[in-house]
Amino acid sequence: MKWIDLHCDTLSILTGGADTGIKRGRAGLRENNLCVDARRLKEAGAAAQFFACYVNASDFCNGEVRRNGEIWDRAYRKILSMTAYAACAQDERFRIARSAED
């Protein structure tokens, strides 16, 4: 049976975007010691996996940043770094979808 998981925090944890207290250990989207990785998704016959790109914007602020709004730019740059990290793990089974056609 093919299945789709619509939310997974693995990417956020691996890139430090989520403060979970979980030790990263062997870390990577292809294989890790968390709940989801590409190897196990393939073994389970997953049709798709949506990795969350979570950041806590307050982690990027100080008094000056809060006043000039740069907090959102910093948080967005962190999200872009997460998608770049995921792109490094792409192969024939594991790809980033950026549109409905993908």
Residue ranges and their predicted role:
Residues M1-D102:
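N-terminal hydrophobic targeting/anchoring segments and the immediately downstream early-domain regions
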